């Protein structure tokens, strides 16, 4: 993708917003017969409590008031993942991959080893990504996580994985349909008991939207939500259906770099913190 002309790209972003938001209302998503995150399922009010502990760390970093950005990718690996990894390599930027292990992406699981070998963080998302299955009960959710850990264990040291992202986010409401109104409260408490940290996001690429948003739209979505943020945790996807995310990624990285952000994995962000994260 060619870099957009700086003078015009912000103006274009505003023109694109109406079309993008309209597409979000029509989201129903499958990738080759398998359910993945869609904007319909993703919470519109994510838990952004990480900002309360990461912002002081950013302000104190080297005494410069440096800003922090974590690039995160859900629902991979897939055929898109090598494109993402190549851009990250070229730009020398770390990322966090919240991986899954469904039937349709099993052949791509060896890419998890490549991600880890390249210094990226591996974190847990889901094995099946079937909301009805995983959110039926706490037992069903943790069984899914166990299946995920077993599937990825040949490619990474699962004993070191202490971070996860709930499908749909920790404040999603779709889970209530299957596990009742307290299912997420219960799962978050159990995650803490098991020594996991869960994290949502405060910048959403909206790349799982119906209609497959263009690279320009994805770029604009990120730019819009990142404006004036000291700490950004960016939600993106590296599925077979989100190759436009890979196309947008070079410009996304360049923009954050131009704005003076420091790139971190989620774990690195925690290490910078001046106090313990709220769900540690």
Which role does the model predict for each range below?
Residues 1-70, 86-95, 154, 202, ...:
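Terminal accessory/targeting
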Residues 88, 115, 190-191, 256:
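Generic structural signal for hydrophobic
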Residues 38-163, 271-272:
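Active-site beta->alpha N-cap acidic-glycine motif
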């Amino acid at each position: 993708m060619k870099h957009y002309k700086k003078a015009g790209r912000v103006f274009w972003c505003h023109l694109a917003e109406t079309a993008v938001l309209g597409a979000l209302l029509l989201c129903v998503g499958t990738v080759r017969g398998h359910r993945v995150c869609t904007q319909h399922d993703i919470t519109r009010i994510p838990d952004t409590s990480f900002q309360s502990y990461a912002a002081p760390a950013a302000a104190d970093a080297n005494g410069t008031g440096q800003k922090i950005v974590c690039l995160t990718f859900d629902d991979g690996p897939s055929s898109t993942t090598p494109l993402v990894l190549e851009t990250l390599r070229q730009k020398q930027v770390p990322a966090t991959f919240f991986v899954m292990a469904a039937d349709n992406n099993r052949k791509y699981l060896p890419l998890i080893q490549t991600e880890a070998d390249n210094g990226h963080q591996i974190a847990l998302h889901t094995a099946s990504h079937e909301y009805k299955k995983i959110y039926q009960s706490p037992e069903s959710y943790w069984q899914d996580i166990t299946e995920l850990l077993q599937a990825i264990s040949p490619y990474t040291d699962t004993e070191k994985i202490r971070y996860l992202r709930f499908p749909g986010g920790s404040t999603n409401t779709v889970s209530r349909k299957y596990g009742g109104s307290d299912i997420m409260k219960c799962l978050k408490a159990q995650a803490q008991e098991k020594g996991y940290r869960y994290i949502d996001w405060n910048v959403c690429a909206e790349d799982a939207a119906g209609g497959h948003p263009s690279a320009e739209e994805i770029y604009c979505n990120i730019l819009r939500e990142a404006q004036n943020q000291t700490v950004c945790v960016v939600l993106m996807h590296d599925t077979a259906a989100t190759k436009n995310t890979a196309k947008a990624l070079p410009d996304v990285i360049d923009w954050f770099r131009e704005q003076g952000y420091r790139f971190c994995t989620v774990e690195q962000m925690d290490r910078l913190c001046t106090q313990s994260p709220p769900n540690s």
